[in-house]
């Protein structure tokens, strides 16, 4: 199946296609290959094992977990994650994670196996033309038809995945060509891309801010992804503008900061005369870009700032917009704002801070609730004080994770992962694996709804085999809570919304080699969490919660 390798020239790399692909991945900062064993991609494993030093191979129990781990690696490290999936069902099992990466702007490269080119059309095992399946949910999807295409094609893939606007890239290589050899220039680390904003656009936004009496800034995931968190905090503090954070923007303005008004979100967005949205789409999470305007009031003017032109909203009515490297954008904008008028906004900030304090006081009762069955908020009343500043908290669920979004305020950026706007359950175990590898000394906490737990809990086996301690907390209300309440409201009944009562998920983890316990008394949540953090093993705390204590929401989020 292999050919004699061509003779390398100085500065060239030679070897089979798997070796070449691994070399490119390493040049782009990849440290771990996430995979589930498949013969179509054996050369990738050989390339990883024989690299100097070897590349870490992290094998899982379901390809979705490998792809979700690569997606989360992209979020956490801000360099593309790598998943290697065998042909056919291996690739299709990873499609949901690829779609999540596309929606969230997560840099990742997925390398798929492919049936041999020299038998294509003859009915080889798992013969499937995969790029058309993935094309609609990726930045780029293509086949690298020969071993000689791998160096350049993989470099293009990683460059595209890691460039604004970030996202997933898929390539597959025919099995026969994966084993063939080629030579080409040795890969080098790419230079970072920094696109400056249009100075006229910067000036226009600065003028709007200077005219505003009640501005609000929203900081989203792309601020973190673009490594602009320091510039964003500098902008908020120097300009004195209240801020709301979402997605991986959480923690950029740390919890308890006087200008963080996420707990006064409704008042801030309904009362603002200017909303500057930076690094997040104007989607269902932000009212599709319409703020205020109730009872005949004038809606807020809206500014959208993005990392690339394709991310600027086309459906919302915008007063201004700009795009570019977000550090450059924010620093340029701050310089213009400082040169312009600075209205006294102390009353606006004071009102929002008062609401934050009142909300915090009101939440205290829920966080300490002694209700039986347990109110899910009580879990966060016990968990939040136990989180270190560098903790990574992962949400995989519906109602239970909605409570987390309300009560968990990261002390630092890069410490919160959720599925993002795609809303895909089952991402949690992959994200937990990625977080433990990316942050080996940090607390890693995976928050699971009991519905979400059913998607991926078998990959606790992966945590155990690879000695990756993670604390898992299940909010177990024996229902699909995000569907049960709305269906009852619409129809007066619900179907297909109940799960088996009080399922012993802790026993699943024990059977796979981890540890865990069930909690039915709110006073035992804290001690159970202490045991979990001290255990040094994958540990699941299964908290039986009240199905009627649903997260209050104004819309279905669609």
Place the predicted regions along the sequence by residue.
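Thiamine diphosphate
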Residues: 42-117, 121-126, 265, 269, 271-283, 313-315, 321-323, 402-480, ...
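Phosphate/pyrophosphate-binding active-site segments
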Residues: 2-12, 148, 184-186, 299-397, ...
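Glycine-rich, acidic loop regions that bind phosphate or pyrophosphate groups
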Residues: 112-153, 175, 245-351
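Conformationally flexible catalytic loops at phosphate/diphosphate-handling active centers
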Residues: 128, 144, 156, 160-211, ...
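Glycine-rich, anion-gripping cofactor-binding loops and their flanking helix/strand elements
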Residues: 75, 221-303, 401, 410-442, ...
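Glycine-rich phosphate/diphosphate-binding loops that line cofactor/substrate pockets in enzymes
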Residues: 19-30, 72-78, 102, 160-164, ...
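Active-site diphosphate/adenylate-binding microenvironment
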Residues: 18-22, 26-30, 36-49, 354-435, ...
């Amino acid at each position: 199946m292999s050919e004699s390798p061509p003779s390398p020239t100085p500065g060239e790399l030679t070897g089979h296609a798997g070796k070449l692909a691994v070399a490119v991945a390493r040049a782009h900062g990849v440290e771990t290959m996430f995979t589930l064993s498949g013969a179509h991609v054996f050369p990738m494993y050989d390339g990883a094992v024989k690299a100097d030093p070897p590349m870490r191979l992290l094998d899982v129990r379901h390809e979705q977990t490998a792809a979700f781990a690569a997606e989360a690696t992209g979020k956490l490290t801000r360099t593309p994650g790598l998943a290697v999936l065998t042909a056919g069902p291996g690739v299709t099992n990873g499609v949901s994670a690829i779609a999540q990466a596309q929606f969230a702007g997560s840099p990742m490269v997925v390398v798929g196996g492919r049936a041999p080119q020299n038998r294509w059309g003859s009915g080889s095992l798992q013969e499937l033309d995969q790029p058309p399946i993935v094309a609609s949910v990726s930045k780029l999807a293509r086949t690298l038809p020969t071993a000689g295409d791998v160096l350049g094609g993989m470099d293009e893939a990683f460059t595209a995945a890691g460039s604004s606007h970030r996202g997933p890239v898929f390539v597959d290589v025919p099995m026969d060509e994966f084993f063939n050899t080629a030579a080409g220039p040795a890969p080098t680390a790419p230079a970072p891309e920094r696109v400056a904003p249009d100075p006229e656009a910067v000036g226009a936004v600065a003028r709007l801010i200077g005219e505003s009496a009640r501005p609000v800034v929203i900081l989203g995931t792309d601020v973190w992804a673009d490594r602009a968190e320091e510039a964003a905090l500098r902008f908020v503090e120097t300009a004195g503008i209240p801020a709301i954070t979402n997605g991986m923007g959480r923690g950029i303005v740390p919890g308890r900061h006087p200008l963080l008004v996420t707990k006064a979100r409704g008042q801030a967005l309904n009362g603002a005369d200017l909303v500057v949205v930076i690094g997040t789409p104007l989607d269902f999470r932000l009212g599709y870009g319409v703020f205020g305007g109730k009872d005949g009031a004038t809606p807020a003017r809206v500014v959208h700032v993005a990392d690339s032109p394709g991310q600027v909203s086309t459906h919302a009515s915008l007063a201004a917009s700009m795009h570019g490297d977000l550090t450059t954008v924010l620093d340029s904008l701050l310089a213009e704002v400082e040169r312009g008028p600075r209205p006294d906004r102390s009353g606006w900030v004071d009102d929002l801070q008062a609401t934050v304090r009142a909300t915090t006081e009101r939440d205290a009762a829920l966080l300490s609730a002694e209700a039986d069955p347990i109110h899910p908020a009580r879990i966060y009343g016990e968990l939040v004080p136990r989180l270190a500043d560098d903790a990574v908290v992962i949400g995989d669920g519906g109602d239970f994770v909605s409570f987390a979004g309300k009560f968990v305020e990261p002390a630092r950026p890069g410490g919160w992962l959720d599925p993002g706007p795609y809303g895909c359950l089952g991402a949690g175990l992959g994200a937990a694996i990625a977080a433990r590898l990316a942050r080996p000394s940090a607390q890693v906490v995976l928050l699971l709804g009991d519905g979400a737990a059913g998607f991926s809990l078998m990959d606790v086996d992966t945590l155990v085999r690879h000695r990756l301690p993670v604390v898992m907390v299940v909010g177990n209300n024996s229902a699909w809570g995000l569907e049960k309440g709305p269906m009852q409201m619409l129809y007066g009944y619900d179907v297909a919304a109940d799960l088996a009562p009080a399922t012993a998920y802790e026993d699943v983890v024990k059977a796979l080699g981890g540890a865990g316990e069930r909690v039915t008394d709110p006073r035992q949540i804290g001690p159970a969490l202490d045991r979990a953090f001290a255990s040094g093993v994958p540990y699941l705390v299964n908290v039986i919660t009240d199905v009627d204590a649903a997260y209050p929401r104004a819309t279905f989020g669609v």
